[in-house]
Amino acid sequence: MREKWLIGYDLSDNYAQISFLSDKAAEPETLSVLPGAEKYHIPLCLRKRKGFNQWFYGMDALKHKEEGEMVTDLFRLAKKGEPVVIEETGYDPIALLTLYVKRSLSGLSVIGDTDHVEAFMFSCESLDERTVEVLKQVAAGLSLKTKSFFYQSYAESFYQYMVHQPEDIWVRQVLLCDYHSDVMKIYRMECNRRTTPMVVYIEKAERNFFACGDYPEEEEKKQNVFTQMDEKMLAMAQELAEGQMITSVYLIGEGFSEEWMKESLRFLCRNRRVFQGNNLYSKGACYALRERLYPTEISGRYVFLGEDKLKANIGMKVYRQGESSYLALLDAGVSWYDARFQTEVYLEEGNSFDIVLTPLNGKDARYGKVTLTGLPERKTPTRLYIEISMTGENKVRLYVEDLGFGELSPSGYQKWTENFEI
């Protein structure tokens, strides 16, 4: 039996990173741009060879400086949607991003034939409607046999990575410091172990920091900058830790590649475990895929409520075999871009029904009335097709179609769409 592979693809504004997980392995591995080295970042750029339809990507694009014009910011350009002009020709920015992703996947020759990729997960900093739309178009253009493409935020990749680590590492809070460019992004993960299932929250914050890599050439001046960085990091770490129970800290990003942490590292290591690395998001994406396709007890024990998660249960009061019952339409904890449910119900009388929203924050359930204006009066029940989905983090779309009641009451072919916010 050939191995099946799960691919976790970390797509940031400046680089990509690829991890892969075999159905025969316990942990993911990460593709290195240099064999034998732990260099995982693939620069997010393309370069077109002047006068030819030949494209270089990643490290090769950086090396071939004299070959032609280079395009950076591929992800931002794709989301912006405006044509990219190269040699007086306009190129679709989503097509360029798709080309980059396809070329970067050529490195997966280490796993053999990509026909055996079972599922693919994109992970990026955040997911709004435009980002999901772009990623879906990229996925459609990759020519992979699998049709199982998924999307998740860095916060959820962090969560998935952590819940697959020994529990003593995250029994209390966990801090993730992601240092790129001149910004320190901080994720704080905490689990409420008093609920069933246990609810995991992640708070996100940003701090301006020193521009990483932009250091003086003179060693003494460079060390002075490092000292200032260390002092600022120490002050920030003390502030983040004040009054908090932090079990472990993860330091990721190019900003931590230089050895400038001295006093700040000593402080973080007091009664805490500190880890450094650069492939957490792509590995977290692999773990998420495995949990989605082959659920373990983790799925039953924990629910993650991130920014892009539905934070309320949505359902209807219905009758089953003469008894009052609850019909779940959407469950809290699902990502808004994955939230979709369809069903058929019978409306016994009238032209309206109620939707029930039950928040997970302990607030009272609230009811919303859906009125089907123009629905004909019938002596028989009306069969309704109902489809519910989400168009944003707090935006719900409800589609209803009149199916009538067989020959006794033919359908009026009426359709209704309602949009509401949670």
Stretch-by-stretch model annotation:
Residues 1-82, 140, 150-152, 372, ...:
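Early-domain small/polar-rich strand-loop-helix modules and first-structured segments
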Residues 1-6, 144-175, 280-305, 378:
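Conserved phosphate-binding catalytic cores of ATP/NTP-utilizing and phosphoryl-transfer enzymes
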Residues 2, 8-15, 168-185, 189-192, ...:
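A short acidic Gly-Thr/Ser loop motif
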Residues 16, 41-49, 191-232, 288, ...:
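Glycine-rich phosphate-binding loop plus the immediately following alpha-helix
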Residues 32-123, 206-234:
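Conserved phosphate-binding loops in N-terminal lobes of ATP-dependent enzymes
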Residues 95-163, 278:
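Active-site neighborhood for divalent-cation/phosphate handling
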Residues 121-131, 238-265, 273, 277:
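Glycine-rich phosphate-binding loops at beta-strand->alpha-helix junctions
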